[in-house]
């Protein structure tokens, strides 16, 4: 079974020889400095160079045992294309917004529409084409910003969160525009050859906005996005929500995404209870991956697998300073699991 076959079957809820081990990309980036050194492609240059981007993610797949290719390596491509100013970071830090595109939600007409033929959006689609040709057996995951996280990259988050209660129509209008642009970026990535969509909305945590606002301002937009990719392209989706999702209750069951990924603070048994019927993904601590040792990571990985996780993955991506040997410990545990089960 190839890596692509295993992941696509797992996302479809079909039987696989063992759970796949993936790290989608985007905010859950799979890139570490040891891989950069090995393939001689580095941040921040790779964020703006399609060939370097492709070579770096392919190197991560081949050197760490992560069973996918994932790009971009950040959550700023859509925001930059819509008018935000972005710094590309450094060798050990991801791109980040340095200036919002809007001073208030009333400035929505200042925003530009993403042009997927230009800038870093074009870099990403070109990188997907390169990867499709070089590694057709490895699944390519296209990463998009969720509507709330994109909105809070375009305007001060405090203004946005305030609007959820005292300016709802303005918040919905910004959500709709954010979703429209994320969909355009996703369409371009899928048309270039991406196999799976991952939508991360870390700014939409239950702790920040509560269940009622999640049901009104997050759930409908995430579901519209995942239905779009399923119906238009036949592609499955993963949705990642940060924070402790207990406050959301079973609202996760209403997500139409095939798979749900959550923070390490949420155990696999709880995730399976809150997102019944969904393919579960997680839940190795990002901090443990960076600061732990291979033996501890092997034990934690085995625990996740024994608890029934469907897709083994870092909870919130991988720190660039994470040792390759720590990632390999997780990969090797996943590969052995079929003989342990």
Describe each region flagged by the PLM.
Residues 3-31, 36-39, 67, 89-97, ...:
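Active-site loop segments of alpha/beta catalytic cores
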Residues 28, 33-63:
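Active-site-flanking structural segment that lines cofactor/substrate pockets
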Residues 53, 57, 78, 104-107, ...:
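Generic hydrophobic, aliphatic-rich segments that mediate packing or membrane embedding
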Residues 71-114, 137:
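A contiguous, low-structure linker/loop signature
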Residues 47-48, 73, 242:
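Active-site nucleophile and cofactor-binding loops and adjacent substrate-binding regions
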Residues 56-77:
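N-terminal low-complexity or amphipathic/hydrophobic leaders
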